[in-house]
Amino acid sequence: MSTQSRPVVIAGNWKMHMTCAQAKQYAAAFLPQVANAPKDRSIVLAPPFTAISTLQEALAGSDVQIASQNVHWKDSGAFTGEISAEMLLELGVGYTIVGHSEPRKYFSESDEQINQRARASQAAGLIPILCVGESDEQRSSNETERVIRRQVEQGLEGIDPSKLVVAYEPIWAIGTGKTCESEEANRVCGLIRNWVGYPNLTIQYGGSVKPGNIDELMAKSDIDGVLVGGASLEPDSFARIANYQMASAAAAA
């Protein structure tokens, strides 16, 4: 895991799952299990927009924070289906996920648009979680470093790295059950830190994170948290992840 000077962020991305009623039930089951979680980490949940208010109410009095799965770069306007940073702030949101591989793929989101979303987030006082990662084809062609460096450099233009989280999510590992080897995940996270040039940058790993591999991942020197998809949909599973314990020192090499 990172040195204690780097904030640790454990985030669950629900994607298009959970109604308001389900979010409320989730919180009731989840909160007792993380009530005594170590204070060296931030626990974050990213529900669908429709469940943000309900979940915020259900989490009242706890340290669990809310993230948005998207944010537009304009304050207001004729942008059907979008939501502004100001609107999210009013709901008590603290983080925004930008650049996830799914909107990159399904909506052809560009690095420039992702950068605009990240900049709008920071300007409003939200912390963007910038997702970067390579496809299986790019990985097989030894393009991992080139692709991710481009995403980092273009996505972070004009961004303050002290108010930022970067999530390395190899696309080939998202929702596939395939997990990037912890040593390789750590290597890429270290490269990202060097490219950004900010030693205290919080860098997450994402891609088939589950209770069975969280301890090993968090023992790595350049991994400062995780962005969890499917395993965050079950409160018991995500609570185990949020309550991770450090693996043996040997695994941290």
Swiss-Prot record:
First-listed, main subcellular location of the protein, grouped into a coarse class: cytoplasm
PROSITE patterns: TIM_1, TIM_2
One BP annotation, GO: glycolytic process
Annotated catalysed reactions: D-glyceraldehyde 3-phosphate = dihydroxyacetone phosphate
Entry keywords, A to Z: Cytoplasm, Gluconeogenesis, Glycolysis, Isomerase
Gene3D superfamilies: Aldolase class I
Pathway this chain belongs to: Carbohydrate biosynthesis; gluconeogenesis; Carbohydrate degradation; glycolysis; D-glyceraldehyde 3-phosphate from glycerone phosphate: step 1/1
Keyword match Magnesium: no
Pfam families per record: TIM
InterPro entries tied to this protein: Aldolase_TIM, TIM_sf, TrioseP_Isoase_bac/euk, Triosephosphate_isomerase, Triosephosphate_isomerase_AS
GO cellular component term, pick one: cytosol
Binding site for substrate: N13, W14, K15, G175, S208, G229, G230
EC number(s) given by UniProt: 5.3.1.1
Keyword Lipid metabolism: no
Catalytic residue list: H100, E169
Compartments where found: Cytoplasm
GO molecular function, one term: triose-phosphate isomerase activity
Subunit structure: Homodimer.
UniProt record similarity statement: Belongs to the triosephosphate isomerase family.
Function: Involved in the gluconeogenesis. Catalyzes stereospecifically the conversion of dihydroxyacetone phosphate (DHAP) to D-glyceraldehyde-3-phosphate (G3P).
NCBIfam families: tim
Name listed for the protein in its UniProt record: Triosephosphate isomerase
Species whose genome carries this gene: Synechococcus sp. (strain RCC307)
